[in-house]
A protein has these predicted regions:
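Metallo-beta-lactamase
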Residues: 5, 98-147
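Conserved beta-strand hairpin/beta-sheet module of binuclear metal-dependent hydrolase folds
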Residues: 3-60, 149-160
Length: 165
């Protein structure tokens, strides 16, 4: 079973990882999801595929109210990264999904409407989170075209998705 573990805490600014699941079925790719919180603002990075949604949701729910997640960051378009989007939108229909402009017509097949998606230009963008800004940094072709990393300059943590996978 996946568990949520805090990696960084500074007041109301937190980073947590939903770590690998040693009990997962061998035919399912395992991923690590990260929850970044600043005040009342929360972003979930690469929330995973449909197959692992129940264990990710359970792990997050044990430490955090998942209805407070109002942003998702998708490093790229692969189903193991973002196909659970539709299920997260059932938890909070107001979630905004930040992803490369390149995938704005592909990822909606997993759920959402035009208003769900916030396109990231090739050069990257700053994403507000509470009173700080995270930086979507281009990492094109390090795993996929339109791939992005996410940098938190306050915590000095870089989310690199599944580069090298």
């Amino acid at each position: 079973m996946k568990k949520l573990r805090y990696l960084y805490t500074d007041g109301d600014h937190k980073w947590a990882v939903v770590a690998r699941d040693p009990e997962r079925p061998p035919f399912v790719i395992d991923t690590n999801e990260y929850l970044i919180v600043k005040g009342d603002d929360a972003i979930l990075t690469d929330p995973g595929g449909l197959e692992i949604f129940p264990v990710v949701f359970t792990a997050v729910s044990q430490e955090f109210n998942p209805e407070q997640i109002n942003k998702i960051f998708s490093s790229h378009q692969d189903p193991d990264i973002i196909s659970s989007l539709g299920l997260w939108l059932e938890v909070n229909p107001d979630i905004r999904c930040h992803l490369s402009w390149l995938w704005r017509t592909f990822v909606p097949h997993f759920g959402g409407t035009r208003d769900t998606f916030v396109s990231i230009p090739d050069e990257g963008v700053r994403i507000p989170l509470g009173d700080i800004e995270l930086e979507a940094i281009p990492a094109h072709y390090l795993h996929s075209c339109g791939n992005f990393n996410l940098w938190d300059p306050k915590a000095k943590i870089l989310f690199s998705g599944d580069i090298g996978a």
